[in-house]
Curated annotation (Swiss-Prot):
The protein's name in its UniProt record: Transcriptional regulator AacuR
Applications reported: Secalonic acids show unprecedented anticancer activities against various human cancer cells and might be interesting for further derivatization, targeting diseases such as cancer.
Biased composition (Low complexity): 76-102
InterPro entries associated with the record: AflR (IPR013700), Zn2-C6_fun-type_DNA-bd_sf (IPR036864), Zn2Cys6_DnaBD (IPR001138)
SMART domains according to UniProt: GAL4 (SM00066)
Lineage: Eukaryota, Fungi, Dikarya, Ascomycota, Pezizomycotina
Its biological purpose: Transcriptional regulator; part of the gene cluster that mediates the biosynthesis of the tetrahydroxanthone dimer secalonic acid D.
UniProtKB keywords: DNA-binding, Metal-binding, Nucleus, Transcription, Transcription regulation, Zinc
Positions of the UniProt region annotated as Disordered: 1-24, 63-104
Amino acid sequence: MTSLQCPPPDRTRRSLSPTGPKFRESCKSCAASKIRCTKEKPQCARCVKRNMVCEYLESKRARRKPGARLKHRESITTNAHHSPTTTTITTSRTTSSSPSASPKTYHPLNYVDILSWTPTPTLPDSATDTQTGLHCNFDDFLAFSHSTSLLGVPEAGELPVHLTTDFRQLEELNRAPEALDEILQCRCSEDGYQLAILSVVILKVLGWYATIIRPLLGVEAHSPGVGEGTTVRTDSLAETQLSSSFYVDSGQQISPKITMGPPLAYGRESEGKTRMAAQLILSQLHRVQRLVNILCHRFKLHSNREQNPAWNSSTASTATEPEGPAYIEHLYPFSSLVFDQIEKDVRGRLRSLSTELLEMLRY
């Protein structure tokens, strides 16, 4: 008995051959006149009646071009063939007792910048704002300190004593008074800790001004070795050592020694550059003087609070000095003697630098 099998039905496959272009339903003349076209082809009745050229334009509808999907697959295939092979890296855990473990290389302490590190807040921004109420924007000052490393150690690991006489350094250094002025306008600068930090920054700025101008006066500076540092003060050009002292991260104090070199030979090419640098620094010292006056005024406010705890800061505040928060008035982080000594050091350093610049420009 023979079994009859029906032939499989013919599955008509859609032709992938590109179809012809589609034309618009209205001719060009009817579309321009905004009249309903009769849509006869090759010529509509209106164009035949008026003896006009009837032209049907190609439709510009956005549609997928025939064969575009096939080309896309071919491009993906070619890119997969030409792509480089990726290597997988497997990491194995090594215990501290394994002898084959490589020793860890720690970052040297000389590369650490104080102001480049900012602590991560543990509380959300809304919680910290409601608790403290202090809103200070230190972004500009931190960016400036990162570029000039005022409170940090240079990347070379050496003390920044001998500097090149580049006026771009002076232009970057002149941004420090602007940043300090913005910080002093904030209420958080009423705190004694902030005042002490700002005083150290001002001393550092004055020290950098001195290290830029003193090599131009024939003064050579070199850093002593470890264990050779001693702290020595200076007040004029005739003295042989710099007053600013530096501290390394190990806790040992190092102060740069200054040895007098030959005097500056006026009349050479370096004379004009030296005098120009001195005039530029001297023109910026009045801004530093203003910052020192604000700091000293706030030192006196803290001294008055220490002597009289019931003293109200609103009675002594001026238009330029913002009134501090009420909960800061009872904070006395330092005694009045410490602030008096800081004031003497800052004013003495500013007076010494101004005297040196005036003596140099006088001749």
